[in-house]
């Protein structure tokens, strides 16, 4: 069973499949907020991601399990006013004897999901064409307001903030390998497709 040490933004070592199926249940039950975490990491993707602001810093994700705790380097992204087009999540886990089992959770490709305030703790975040409004690079993490307590207060941070409400942070083809994702306002979806598979689940 996983555990979380205080002072760390942690990815608790639970099966990725259970995390993703639990996410589907959380959506169906209309939870006000949701936190997803997996020691193995899970894929988060969207064909288009927009936000009114983004704070990006460096920290650690602490994975704790029966064998002890391990810190993994991670990027920490705090985004506000976030909207995802074609939101997709994919997770995979290895079950003894059975082998690999994966699950893909996705909206329709054209659906725009308003996820509001988001904290993403990830091994990697990639995107294609990226538009950033007023941007400060090299600001101290404490001054930028990066949420992770594992970040060095005097360490590197990048901030980008909309000045007019229309000049948004805009990431095309965003794809992240996430350890943890917190959705402060929960989700309202116009469609939802949960697909378990015995092959490798991906958002591609």
Which ranges hold each PLM region?
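Hydrophobic membrane-targeting and insertion signals
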Residues: 1-65
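Compositionally biased, intrinsically disordered low-complexity regions
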Residues: 4, 9, 24-26, 32, ...
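Intrinsically disordered, low-complexity segments enriched in small/polar residues
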Residues: 5, 20-22, 66, 79, ...
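Extracytoplasmic beta-rich ectodomain segments of secreted or membrane-anchored proteins
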Residues: 48-128
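Acidic, glycine-rich flexible loop segments
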Residues: 111-182, 190
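Short, low-complexity, Pro/Ser/Thr/Gly-rich segments in the mature regions of secreted, periplasmic
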Residues: 188-204
């Amino acid at each position: 069973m996983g555990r979380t040490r205080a002072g760390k933004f942690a990815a608790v070592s639970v099966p990725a499949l259970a995390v993703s199926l639990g996410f589907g249940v959380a959506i169906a039950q209309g939870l006000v907020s949701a936190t997803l975490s997996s020691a193995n990491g899970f894929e988060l993707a969207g064909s288009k991601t927009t936000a009114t602001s983004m704070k990006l810093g460096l920290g650690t994700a602490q994975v704790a399990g029966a064998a002890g705790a391990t810190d993994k380097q991670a990027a920490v992204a705090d985004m506000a006013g976030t909207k995802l087009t074609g939101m997709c999540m994919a997770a995979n886990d290895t079950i003894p004897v059975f082998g690999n089992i994966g699950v893909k959770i996705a909206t329709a490709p054209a659906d725009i999901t308003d996820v509001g305030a988001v904290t993403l703790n990830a091994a990697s975040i990639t995107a294609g064409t990226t538009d950033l409004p007023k941007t400060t690079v090299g600001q101290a993490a404490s001054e930028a307001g990066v949420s992770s307590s594992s970040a060095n207060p005097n360490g590197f941070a990048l901030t980008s903030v909309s000045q007019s409400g229309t000049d948004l942070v805009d990431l095309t083809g965003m794809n992240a390998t996430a350890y943890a994702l917190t959705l402060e306002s929960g989700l309202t979806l116009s469609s939802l497709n949960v697909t378990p598979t015995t092959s490798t689940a991906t958002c591609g």
